[in-house]
Amino acid sequence: MSSGTLYDKVWDLHRVAELPGGSTQLFVGLHLIHEVTSPQAFAALRDKGLSVRCPERTVATVDHIVPTTSQSRPFADSLAEEMLSTLERNCADHGITLNGIGSGRQGIVHVIAPELGLTQPGMTVACGDSHTSTHGAFGAIAFGIGTSQVRDVLASQSLAMSKLKVRRIQVNGRLSDGVSAKDLILHVIRTLGVKGGVGFAYEFAGPAVEALSMEERMTLCNMAIEGGARCGYVNPDQVTFDYLSGRAGAPSGAAWDRAVSWWRGLASDPDAVVDDEVVFDAASIAPTVTWGITPGQGLGIDECIPQLEQLEPGERPIAEEAYRYMDLQPGTAIAGVPVDVCFIGSCTNGRLSDLRAAAAVARGRHVADGIKAFVVPGSEQVAKAAEAEGLDRVFQDAGFEWREPGCSMCLAMNPDRLEGRQISASSSNRNFKGRQGSASGRTLLMSPAMVAAAAVHGQVTDVRTLSLQSAV
C-alpha cells in the first residue's frame, strides 16, 4: 500500500483511469440511494437501455419524505407515496436491497449504513445527499453527489473526481464536560468559515478526536460539508473496529482478522505530508449555538451576537442579512433567546448516544409551557434500542413527542415543518432561510443536550448549568 495520508491511500486504491483534464475515474465501493435523488437517475438508465452495474454494492432506504407521526400506507401526501412507490419499483427491477418501512432496518441513510456495518474503512462511498461525508468517520472517503452522478454510479459503479487537498484539523486536549462533537464541529466551522474547506478533505485528528465514540465521530464528519470541505474523515482505530465487530455487514471469523489487519494500515502515516493544518484546543470550546443563517454564524453559549464592527469586512453583508431575518440584535446574549419548537434528530444527531444525552437532560423535568418538542430516532434500530432502555418514556414523561424514524424537521420535505416566524432549537445541520419548512422560520443549531435544555426552559440554555441524570 502506498504511503501518505488515508485520503491518498484510499484514492490510489480506487483509481480506475486518469481522465483528460486531470480528473480521475474512481471505483465506488458503496452506493447509497434514497427516494429523492434516485428517480431521475433510474429514468435515465431506462432511457438509455442500461442496467445497474453492481446492485450488490447499492443499498436503498426511504428517509426524506416519510411522515414521523404515522407511517401507514398509503401516505396522506400523494407525492410522498409516489416517490416511495417509485423507489420500491426501481429497487425491485434492478435487484437492489431496499431497507423499507417496517423492515427493522429503515432509517436515515447515513444512520443505517453504519449501524448495519456496511460502511467500512478504506471504502469509497457515494450518495445523492450532501451529508455523505458522515461515513468518513470510519476511515472511508465519502462524497455527496448530484442526480446525474447518481446515474453514472448506477451505470458504471464509478465516478469522475478531481483529487482534493488535505487539511488536518488537529484537536488537542479533551472536550470539557457538557461539550459535544456537535459543539466541536460548529466551532471549527465558525473559525474556518463555511467556505474555508473548499477544495479540501478534512482529516480530523488529535487526542480530542481519538477520544470520541464512533457516533460522535459521525457527527463531526457529517458537518464537514458545512465548512466547505468535500469530505471529512477520521483515521480508523480500535474504536472503529469495536463498533463494527459483529454487525451484519461486517466481516466475521478469519475474514474479520484479515480486514482489521488491512484497515490498520490505512491510517495516515506519521510522516504523511498534508497541505494545511489547523490546531484547536478542545478545552477552550464551549457549548455552541448558531445565531444566524449559516452554520458558520456560531457562538459559545456565554457570548453575545457580534456587533458589525467586530466582524471581518467580508462577513458583514451576511451578518446584516442575518440580523434582519433572525430578528436578533447585535449585542444580544445567545443564552436566553426564546424558542418555539425543539427538534432532536437528523443524520447529524439522531443516534442512540444523542438520544441518551438529551434524555439525561429531560429526565425529571418537563417541557416549558407553549413549547413543541419532539424526538425523531434516526432509524428503526435506534428507536428499538432507545425504547428498550426506556428513553421513549423519559421523553414522553417530560412532554416530548416520540416519533417514527425519518429526516423529519431537518428539511422541509415531509409534514414536520415550522410555521410562520417560529424559531427552533434544532440538532440538525443547516440553518438556512426556510430550511425547516416556513419561508420565514428561524433555526438555531445546537447539540441534542442543548436542545433538551432549551425545551425545558423555553429558551437557549447552557446545559452545563443543569444537573444531569442517567436516562437509562
Swiss-Prot record:
It holds the Pfam family Aconitase. One of its GO terms (molecular function) is metal ion binding. Its cofactor is [4Fe-4S] cluster. GO terms for biological process: L-leucine biosynthetic process. It catalyses: (2R,3S)-3-isopropylmalate = (2S)-2-isopropylmalate. [4Fe-4S] cluster binds at C347, C407, C410. InterPro entries: 3-IsopropMal_deHydase_lsu (IPR004430), Acnase/IPM_dHydase_lsu_aba_1/3 (IPR015931), Acoase/IPM_deHydtase_lsu_aba (IPR001030), Aconitase_4Fe-4S_BS (IPR018136), Aconitase_4Fe-4S_dom (IPR036008), IPM_dehydratase_rel_enz (IPR050067), IPMI_cat (IPR033941). It comes from the Bacteria. Keywords: 4Fe-4S, Amino-acid biosynthesis, Branched-chain amino acid biosynthesis, Iron, Iron-sulfur, Leucine biosynthesis, Lyase, Metal-binding. Its EC number is 4.2.1.33. Pathway: Amino-acid biosynthesis; L-leucine biosynthesis; L-leucine from 3-methyl-2-oxobutanoate: step 2/4. Heterodimer of LeuC and LeuD. Catalyzes the isomerization between 2-isopropylmalate and 3-isopropylmalate, via the formation of 2-isopropylmaleate. Belongs to the aconitase/IPM isomerase family. LeuC type 1 subfamily. This is 3-isopropylmalate dehydratase large subunit. It comes from Parasynechococcus marenigrum (strain WH8102). The lineage of its organism: Bacteria, Bacillati, Cyanobacteriota, Cyanophyceae, Synechococcales. The gene is leuC.
